[in-house]
Amino acid sequence: MTKYVGAIDQGTTSTRFIVFDRKGQIFSVAQREHEQIYPRPGWVEHNAVEIWLNTRTVILEALEKKGLSTSDLAAVGVTNQRETALLWDRKTGEPLYNALVWQDTRTDQLVARYAKEGGQDRLRAKTGLPLATYFSGLKLHWILDNVPGARAKAEAGDALFGNIDTWLLWNLTGGPDGGIHITDVTNASRTQLMDLEKLAWDEDILKLFNIPAACLPRIVSSSERYGTGKGPLEGVTLSGILGDQQAALFGQACLHPGEAKNTYGTGNFMLMNTGEKPFPSTCGLITTVGYKLGDAKAVYALEGSIAITGALVQWLRDNLGIIKNSADIEPLARTVSDNGDVYFVPAFSGLYAPRWDDSARGVVCGLTRFANKGHIARAALEATAYQTREVLEAMVKDSKVAIRELRTDGGMVVNELLMQFQADMVNVPVVRPKVIETTALGAAYAAGLAVGYWASTDDITQNWGVDRRWHPHMAAEQREHLYGSWNKAVERSLGWAR
């Protein structure tokens, strides 16, 4: 019997291949970063070919590290940065343009146009999403309108559209030589083109955005046998697809209504399982598909998305040179006892949930001659916690469910200063699991369940375990003073891009 399940974790800054055992423990991992392309202010692109080549490389490296072959893998799943979208030539496999990253704001004029005609929430009832630059349907709209020849190819069926999951699955199954053109329900729900209840492309929205159905992938469940790999995964069953945040929800064993997790990565993403019916938000959150296992009913989620959290640490490293490595942020922040009344609002791509303001831009408030780089570092970390509190409060108000603990995952959860401050700010315990790579683990679970490697979701629940728990210690008066000052800083960030 095969011993392992693999997961491709294609994120905003890097691609990893992780091999898991039956207990959900990491057996092998390889990782490669890819270039971030910034052609203009607000524009963010990725080279999709570079991402595909990195994917091939990390698969081979992770297997070679432990002397594994593809025959040791029962199945492989894919999880991906959602909303990042591209259009490519069906015959050659060449992208017609760089992938437009989820943070990219070039569709702001399209958002304004459609919002003016019918309001920002005109598509929320069908899609669960407000009009925003975040989602990939309008990114496709921009490519079709601005890349020479793109629309003609798309209408003829000679160009294929997809988020990164679709791009990788197509290449992994042969590319121009019979590649499978599919996307799962979680990724499709991030395009703003899918009807949440019907789980199908919506003809009225396609007509509104002038998008040809011929270029769209077939929508499938998150866990089923899609096909067999070629190239680096020759002969391996490909059987799991989940957008990264839904994968983390699944990997965190949030399998019952009311259970929630918060991922700390390039951005922050809090998701709460709401069961088998879409739960409309009135507090600025989005309604999305959580997962769908084969023929079972889809499970839905409420989500609060924060654009810039870990990316702010990268910005301090790469753009300002305040730190040499991302891990240096915590010791630098610990050189000061508090934030020195400095507040950082990292609205580099506007503000996402619950405010949804594309006009906001980043600001630092409260600077005096007393402030130093330690205060800047601390303010950057605290910004993540303030934004998370804002989303958590909206989620509690929407769902009418009190969150008793916050399950966390992602790269930033190794930062103990941040985790303690997060517990203080939301006033509930913050929990870090033993395996923090829950995004990749969720994709592995989806793939493994489809082929019987794991018998049921009970195995997922049994595998989950606590590594550390942080309890709130901050006095209520101090907590509310800090949060009130943060909100004052947010008001200063609004309206800059108008």
UniProtKB/Swiss-Prot annotation:
Gene Ontology CC entries for this record: cytosol
Residues the record lists as binding sn-glycerol 3-phosphate: T12, R82, E83, Y134, D244
Pathway listed: Polyol metabolism; glycerol degradation via glycerol kinase pathway; sn-glycerol 3-phosphate from glycerol: step 1/1
Alphabetic keyword roster: ATP-binding, Glycerol metabolism, Kinase, Nucleotide-binding, Transferase
Activity regulation, free text: Inhibited by fructose 1,6-bisphosphate (FBP).
Residues that coordinate or bind ATP: T12, T13, S14, T266, G310, Q314, G411
Classification via Pfam families: FGGY_C, FGGY_N
Residues that coordinate or bind ADP: T12, R16, T266, G310, G411, N415
Residues reported in the UniProt entry to bind glycerol: R82, E83, Y134, D244, Q245
Chain's role: Key enzyme in the regulation of glycerol uptake and metabolism. Catalyzes the phosphorylation of glycerol to yield sn-glycerol 3-phosphate.
NCBIfam families for this protein: glycerol_kin, PRK00047.1
Annotated family: Belongs to the FGGY kinase family.
The name this protein goes by in its record: Glycerol kinase
